[in-house]
């Protein structure tokens, strides 16, 4: 009976147009990005409409598109606050309209498919999670969200017989991290690159060029002003350089000692060391003595 229901649900969802599937994938990616942006655990619980015993103090870790056996869990969230440790396995279903009609065939098939996925993922975590001493409660949640506003329309927590596993936080986080989709992780955490503007885009642009022409005129005026200022500053620098060079030369000339050239053979007249004045006195005395002796008569005696 269950196999017949599963087959019918697959057929109903397979007949949906490709546009609906693409819109659903985009809504999933937007919800992942919004969850990754939150820094406080209380805002995450509010966005998902999930109740937690200590929403403000809980530590959260998110993993997206985790492959658990034959199933892929949309989101797995680990929360720990003291001794209360919960592993939320979240399955997202999106709707085009904001009004949820669970009686329709599409909503019934979405609900039954989501419950089957949650049952398989919970069993896989219970059987293949790494062993540890900490007790973790595995809590499956089915959430219906609007594609446009990402508002929660319906939430359901099914009860399965197995919902407790013994593991550790580090081991379980490594186990989920290794099984998460790498491409989805890059799309969520990496920022989009800015678009490059090529030359042919500017040729096809229909915007007016009045603003650009006015801007070009302003640029030319500024260039002229800059050129005149540069000339003025260069002239002022030349003047200051000339003045400084003249001052340096004058200082160097004053600092040099003035030395008169003297020949070794010649002697200075007024230099006492060489006896210039003494020679003059000797000559005068000699002449005066001769004059004195000339005044007195010389006696000549013949023997």
Swiss-Prot record:
Cell compartment(s), UniProt: Virion; Host cytoplasm; Host nucleus, Host nucleolus; Host Golgi apparatus
Main location as per UniProt: virion
Induction cue: Expressed late in the infection cycle.
Protein known as: Protein UL24 homolog
Role description: May participate in nuclear egress of viral particles. Plays a role in the dispersal of several host nucleolar proteins including NCL/nucleolin and NPM1. Since deletion of host NCL/nucleolin negatively impact on nuclear egress, UL24 supposedly acts on this process through its effect on host nucleoli.
Annotated spans, Disordered: 235-280
Family: Belongs to the herpesviridae UL24 family.
UniProt-listed Pfam families: Herpes_UL24 (PF01646)
Keywords, alphabetical: Host cytoplasm, Host Golgi apparatus, Host nucleus, Late protein, Virion
Keyword Signal carried by entry: no
Compositional bias segments (type: Basic residues): 257-277
Hydrolase found in the keyword field: no
């Amino acid at each position: 009976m269950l196999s017949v229901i599963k087959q019918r649900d697959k057929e109903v969802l397979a007949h949906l147009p490709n546009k609906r599937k693409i819109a659903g994938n985009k809504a999933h990616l937007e919800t992942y990005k919004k969850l990754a942006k939150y820094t406080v655990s209380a805002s995450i619980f509010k966005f998902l409409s999930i109740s937690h015993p200590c929403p403000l103090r809980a530590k959260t870790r998110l993993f997206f598109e985790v492959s658990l056996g034959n199933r892929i869990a949309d989101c797995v969230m680990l929360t720990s606050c003291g001794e209360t440790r919960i592993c939320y396995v979240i399955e997202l279903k999106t709707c085009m309209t904001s009004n949820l009609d669970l009686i329709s065939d599409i909503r019934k098939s979405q609900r039954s498919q989501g419950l089957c996925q949650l049952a398989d993922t919970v069993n896989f975590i219970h059987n293949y999670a790494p062993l540890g001493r900490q007790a973790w409660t595995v809590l499956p949640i089915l959430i219906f969200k609007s594609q446009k506003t990402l508002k929660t329309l319906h939430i359901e927590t099914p009860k399965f017989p197995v919902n407790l596993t013994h593991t550790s936080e580090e081991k379980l986080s490594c186990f989920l991290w290794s099984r998460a989709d790498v491409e989805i992780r890059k799309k969520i955490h990496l920022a989009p690159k800015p678009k490059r503007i090529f030359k042919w885009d500017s040729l096809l642009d229909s915007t007016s060029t009045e603003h650009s022409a006015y801007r070009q005129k302003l640029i030319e005026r500024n260039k002229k002003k800059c050129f005149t200022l540069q000339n003025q500053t260069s002239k002022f620098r030349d003047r200051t350089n000339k003045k400084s060079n003249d001052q340096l030369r004058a200082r160097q000339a004053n600092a040099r000692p003035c030395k008169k050239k003297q020949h070794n053979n010649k002697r200075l007249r007024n230099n006492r060391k060489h006896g210039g004045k003494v020679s003059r006195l000797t000559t005068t005395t000699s002449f005066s003595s001769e004059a004195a002796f000339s005044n007195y008569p010389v006696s000549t005696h013949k023997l």
